[in-house]
């Protein structure tokens, strides 16, 4: 049984920008763990809400609704986006938010995705090209799983992701240290 966000949280005071984003948002479910220390709020929105705004919303709910209680609020968002969105246009618009979310989870995976190239040879195919490093090869599956969770599950789109690797560009720091090591052996 869904409720409009404002019906579910009528007393919540939010910034004007955030308020506007929630006009077409529904709360589809609220659940808690057995101890009532963690609450999950499931949202369904017709417009994208960037992760930083989701975090602001979690904070506002925690501070205003559950003040003075040790309760962690987690919002699980999903989207019903218009046909104007394709996986490519979604990534163009939502990439910073995707990176913010990944950065909160893993700085290592964030840096790999941030420096990766994304190419769409077809509307539902993404070629994700990363530097050929041991770290990239061991973390590729996690990055793909994360992207699929966001694009396919959260946003309801079909996308197949294919990894590929490129020879890493030599950094000036690596080159300088190799030259210094070479001079030390002469």
Where are these predicted regions, by residue range?
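Intrinsically disordered, low-complexity basic tails and flexible linkers associated
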Residues: 1-183
């Amino acid at each position: 049984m869904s409720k409009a966000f404002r019906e579910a949280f009528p007393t919540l005071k939010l910034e004007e920008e955030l308020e506007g984003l929630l006009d077409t948002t529904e709360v589809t479910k609220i659940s808690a763990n057995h101890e009532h220390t963690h609450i999950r709020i499931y949202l369904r929105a017709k417009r994208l809400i960037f992760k930083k705004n989701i975090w602001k919303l979690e904070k506002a709910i925690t501070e205003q609704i559950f003040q003075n209680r040790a309760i962690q609020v987690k919002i699980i968002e999903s989207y019903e986006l218009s046909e104007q969105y394709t996986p490519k246009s979604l990534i163009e618009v939502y990439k910073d938010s995707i990176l913010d979310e990944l950065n909160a989870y893993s700085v290592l995976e964030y840096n790999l995705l941030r420096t990766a190239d994304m190419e769409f040879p077809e509307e539902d195919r993404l070629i994700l090209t990363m530097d050929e490093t041991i770290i990239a090869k061991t973390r590729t599956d996690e990055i793909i799983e994360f992207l699929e969770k966001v694009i396919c599950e959260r946003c309801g789109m079909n996308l197949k992701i294919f990894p590929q690797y490129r020879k890493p560009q030599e950094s000036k720091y690596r080159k300088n240290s190799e030259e210094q090591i070479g001079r030390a052996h002469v």
